[in-house]
Curated annotation (Swiss-Prot):
Tissue-specific expression: Ubiquitous expression with high levels in trabecular bone, thymus, small intestine, lung, brain and kidney. Weakly expressed in spleen and bone marrow.
Subunit annotation: Binds to the clefts between the subunits of the TNFSF11 ligand trimer to form a heterohexamer. Part of a complex composed of EEIG1, TNFRSF11A/RANK, PLCG2, GAB2, TEC and BTK; complex formation increases in the presence of TNFSF11/RANKL. Interacts with TRAF1, TRAF2, TRAF3, TRAF5 and TRAF6. Interacts (via cytoplasmic domain) with GAB2. Interacts (via cytoplasmic domain); with EEIG1 (via N-terminus); when in the presence of TNFSF11/RANKL.
Cytoplasmic side: 235-625
Taxonomic superkingdom: Eukaryota
Location of Phosphoserine modifications: S571
Localization per record: Cell membrane; Membrane raft
Listed Polar residues bias regions: 512-524, 603-625
Disordered: annotated segments: 331-356, 388-413, 479-524, 542-625
A GO-annotated cellular component: cell surface
An MF annotation (GO) of this entry: cytokine binding
Positions of disulphide bridges: C35-C47, C48-C61, C51-C69, C72-C87, C93-C113, C115-C128, C125-C127, C134-C152, C155-C170, C176-C195
Region (Required for interaction with EEIG1 and osteoclast differentiation): 532-537
Gene source species: Mus musculus
Protein name per UniProt: Tumor necrosis factor receptor superfamily member 11A
Length: 625
């Protein structure tokens, strides 16, 4: 390094003097700068100053003065250094063209106009146009730019847009958990999430909704049934029991009527079958009886008539003169026949008979309960004399010769109940067989209805006077038919004689008279009123004429009778089935051909120790002496 320093030479003196002269020249060049283009302009060989922003150049510079500048007026502006002789005007923002002043401007800055919201500036037409609207599921991209069209973007997961808009962006789904609710439906890009309250149940499925109407109808039906059952129970408790009882009675009556119709047809068939029986069966001990008193002859020839005249089974019983009056065995029970009660009185017509009165000889199965006549005192009870009510041990006082019988045949008129006393021995032409043309089978008109006398009727020995036949007329009825007297006239005559209105036919009765429309007793002893099936009266010759009298009194004594009004003949009530009162007619026990004694008095019913003249009183299915 030292050798190099030694090689440096000093400047010569002339150079140093030149440098001293040049230094002041350098200082002068730096004090006077040159003319620039931005703020100066060159005029007359010199640089002049320009006007600043907001002013304009009023006059240029001179060699002795600089440029003169003035400020801009209202709505004018100049935003740069200028040498302009005037200012610029601001723009006008027209609202009709959807323009709005964004910056009003000043002297140094211009005014700026922009399109209103929903419009954008189109440089092609220098005007504002409407922005594009985004469809549901799309949203406008933010931030929105002025004077620019809307940019639509699809909504992301968790966001949705459900409207058409050029400014709305996609909105997020509602968070149901933050609201304290349950999510009912999940959201989409076009719809939000549906939230429900925690107490609100979810909507039932469609299947449950389909069964809901059926369930409602079933509940309504059950309610109606329950209400109806309650109403019926209350009504049945108050008055429904009587209604139920009436309904059951009606059903029972209907069933009884149907059963009665069937059994009635069966009875008719049974009656037809019995009517076509052979002659051999008739002669085995069963004979039909007429309403006339018929006596069996000693030889028994008149019993069978033409059927058994030649002999046969009746040959063994020719010497028998006594027969018992019994009922024909019913082939079939007539359940439809109504049985009257004790306090029921009806006047309806009697029903057609299905049976017939028969005669069987003693010794057969039908044996009377009393083999010997019974006698009852004035103070004794007569209930023991009724068949079927008392035993035979207590019936010592009764005098029954023949048992009571019952028949289903109904008399046509009261005249057929009349009885009379017949003496003598003759045949019995009234006995017929089932195949005989003279017999009465119950299917046609009886001879008694035609009021024609029965030919060959003979008076025979003692037989029951209350014989209930199948329609053969009595001798009195035959005589009435021959004389041309109507049964009604005869009935009136009989009623008059029974009441004592005709003293010539019937002498006045002695003793006490008591009774009602159903029964009348004439006696000299204690008067008794009875209401029963059968009334048995025994009167002796001495009891009628009074004790201690050996000779008959001058005044004739009437026979004891039992009267019954014609209107109530078929309405006598008792515990037995309804049967006509054959022997209970008023005047039937008197007159009608009965023999009278020499002193004018009628013959008593039965004499103590006398002939066995039986008075059969046909009551409610029984006959008494």
């Amino acid at each position: 390094m030292a050798p190099r320093a030694r090689r440096r030479r000093q400047l010569p003196a002339p150079l140093l003097a030149l440098c001293v002269l040049l230094v002041p020249l350098q200082v002068t060049l730096q004090v006077t700068p040159p003319c620039t283009q931005e703020r100066h302009y060159e005029h007359l060989g010199r640089c002049c100053s320009r006007c600043e922003p907001g002013k304009y150049l009023s006059s240029k510079c001179t060699p002795t003065s600089d440029s003169v500048c003035l400020p801009c007026g209202p709505d004018e502006y100049l935003d740069t250094w200028n040498e302009e002789d005037k200012c610029l005007l601001h723009k006008v923002c027209d609202a009709g063209k959807a323009l709005v002043a964004v910056d009003p401007g000043n002297h140094t800055a211009p005014r700026r106009c922009a399109c209103t919201a929903g419009y954008h500036w189109n440089s092609d037409c220098e005007c504002c146009r409407r922005n594009t609207e985004c469809a549901p599921g799309f949203g406008a991209q933010h931030p929105l730019q002025l004077n620019k069209d809307t940019v639509c973007t699809p909504c992301l997961l968790g966001f949705f847009s459900d409207v058409f808009s050029s400014t709305d962006k996609c909105k997020p789904w509602t968070n149901c958990t933050l609201l304290g609710k349950l999510e009912a439906h999940q959201g989409t890009t076009e719809s939000d999430v549906v939230c429900s309250s925690s107490m609100t149940l979810r909507r039932p499925p469609k299947e449950a909704q389909a069964y809901l109407p059926s369930l409602i109808v079933l509940l309504l039906f059950i309610s109606v049934v329950v209400v109806a059952a309650i109403i019926f129970g209350v009504y049945y408790r108050k008055g429904g029991k009587a209604l139920t009882a009436n309904l059951w009675n009606w059903v029972n009556d209907a069933c009884s009527s149907l059963s009665g119709n069937k059994e009635s047809s069966g009875d008719r068939c049974a009656g037809s079958h019995s009517a076509t029986s052979s002659q051999q069966e008739v002669c085995e001990g069963i004979l039909l009886m007429t309403r006339e008193e018929k006596m069996v002859p000693e030889d028994g020839a008149g019993v069978c008539g033409p059927v058994c005249a030649a002999g046969g089974p009746w040959a063994e019983v020719r010497d028998s003169r006594t027969f018992t009056l019994v009922s024909e065995v019913e082939t079939q029970g007539d359940l439809s026949r109504k049985i009257p009660t004790e306090d029921e009185y009806t006047d309806r017509p009697s029903q057609p008979s299905t049976g017939s009165l028969l005669l069987i000889q003693q010794g057969s199965k039908s044996i009377p309960p009393f083999q010997e006549p019974l006698e009852v005192g004035e103070n004794d009870s007569l209930s023991q004399c009724f068949t079927g009510t008392e035993s035979t041990v207590d019936s010592e006082g009764c005098d029954f010769t023949e048992p009571p019988s019952r028949t289903d045949s109904m008399p046509v008129s009261p005249e057929k109940h009349l009885t009379k006393e017949i003496e003598g021995d003759s045949c019995l032409p009234w006995v017929v067989s089932s195949n005989s043309t003279d017999g009465y089978t119950g299917s046609g008109n009886t001879p008694g209805e035609d009021h024609e006398p029965f030919p060959g009727s003979l008076k025979c020995g003692p037989l029951p006077q209350c014989a209930y036949s199948m329609g053969f007329p009595s001798e009195a009825a035959a005589s009435m038919a021959e004389a041309g007297v109507r049964p009604q006239d005869r009935a009136d005559e009989r009623g008059a004689s029974g009441s004592g209105s005709s003293p010539s036919d019937q002498p006045p009765a002695s003793g006490n008279v008591t009774g009602n429309s159903n029964s009348t007793f004439i006696s000299s002893g204690q008067v008794m009123n009875f209401k029963g099936d059968i009334i048995v009266v025994y009167v002796s010759q001495t009891s009628q004429e009074g004790p201690g009298s050996a000779e008959p009194e001058s005044e004739p004594v009437g026979r004891p009778v039992q009267e019954e009004t014609l209107a109530h003949r078929d309405s006598f009530a008792g515990t037995a089935p309804r049967f006509p009162d054959v022997c209970a007619t008023g005047a039937g026990l008197q007159e009608q051909g009965a023999p009278r004694q020499k002193d004018g008095t009628s013959r008593p019913v039965q004499e103590q120790g006398g002939a066995q003249t039986s008075l059969h009183t046909q009551g409610s299915g029984q006959c008494a002496e």
